[in-house]
Amino acid sequence: MAKFRASNILGDPFALATVSISILAWLIACIASIISDIKTDYPNYSWWAVAYMFCCIIGVTIVFGSDTGLVYGVAVVGYLSTGLVLTTLAVNTLVYADESSSQAAAAGFILLSMVIVVWIFYFGSSPQATHRGFIDSFALNKESSGAYGNRPMSTAFGPRPDTMSTSAPQMYTSAQLNGFETSSPVSGYPGGAPGSENRSSSQARFGNPSASNVTGNNNGQDEVPQPTEYPYKAKAIYSYDANPEDANEISFSKHEILEVSDVSGRWWQARKSNGETGIAPSNYLILL
């Protein structure tokens, strides 16, 4: 589990406001319940609501502090739904009491119920939801995929390299090259830098140029050459687990820096720091 950081709460206005209001509401309900229990017959199950909501507030605070809302969102919604039932039942009993302390406890439970409804709406929504992206946009230490999922690609980096071409590399004869032969007719393909090998090794590698060209044209549509240049860098705003049935996908963790060669479409060709290459969903990444 991610480490708890107070800055995740202090830097998030939504988390700071809702957690603060929930703590205040719980204190009102708890203190008023103690006073009401001394003066009158206080319903026993309302104490369970007080204890249960204390645990829920602690749990939500930990989720906000560790920034794991996407991981534990479903569990949080389930626990909060139970808490909403308990606080509503407590309000229904206490709000009609004659004792002012019981009515104050009911007010605390009403405020707790309102915060619970807001939390359920937040954690129960997908990260791409408009309202969640808007809320997360105010956080200093959180980046929402919804804010970048549909944004236009920046043109500040110039035209993207054509690294995903399916056409086979053009082969030339020695007469056409007129002494400018290299070990590879296209930079980045096996053979190293230009001039690193002599002409004989180039002929041994490619054999008959015309035969290689025919073979390349036949197989070029089936095999996609891997790009060798990754001019862009992207930061992962969410963790992603690759589909085990798709060997082309790669997994990465949140805040990991990836090198990207192609920034068109919904899937980007990327390379990790350990050299692993594959495709990654663009709405999980943001260009640096």
Curated annotation (Swiss-Prot):
What residues form the membrane-spanning segments? Answer: 15-35, 45-65, 71-91, 104-124
User: Subunit structure of this entry?
Assistant: Forms homooligomers.
Mind telling me what this protein is named? High osmolarity signaling protein sho1
- Organism for this UniProt entry: Neosartorya fischeri (strain ATCC 1020 / DSM 3700 / CBS 544.65 / FGSC A1164 / JCM 1740 / NRRL 181 / WB 181) (Aspergillus fischerianus)
Which InterPro entries does the entry mention?
SH3-like_dom_sf, SH3_domain, Sho1_SH3
Q: How does it sit in the membrane?
A: Multi-pass membrane protein
The record's subcellular location field reads:
Cell membrane
Q: Which gene encodes it?
A: sho1
Q: What is the lineage of its organism?
A: Eukaryota, Fungi, Dikarya, Ascomycota, Pezizomycotina
So which stretches are on the Extracellular side?
36-44, 92-103
Q: What Gene3D superfamilies does the annotation carry?
A: SH3 Domains
Region Disordered: start and end of each range?
183-227
User: What sequence ranges are listed for the domain SH3?
Assistant: 229-288
Glycosylated residues, per the record, are N44
Annotated function: Plasma membrane osmosensor that activates the high osmolarity glycerol (HOG) MAPK signaling pathway in response to high osmolarity.
Q: Name one GO cellular component term.
A: plasma membrane
CDD domains documented for this protein: SH3_Sho1p
- Biological process per Gene Ontology, one example term: regulation of actin filament polymerization
Compositionally biased intervals (Polar residues): 197-221
Q: Which family does it belong to?
A: Belongs to the SHO1 family.
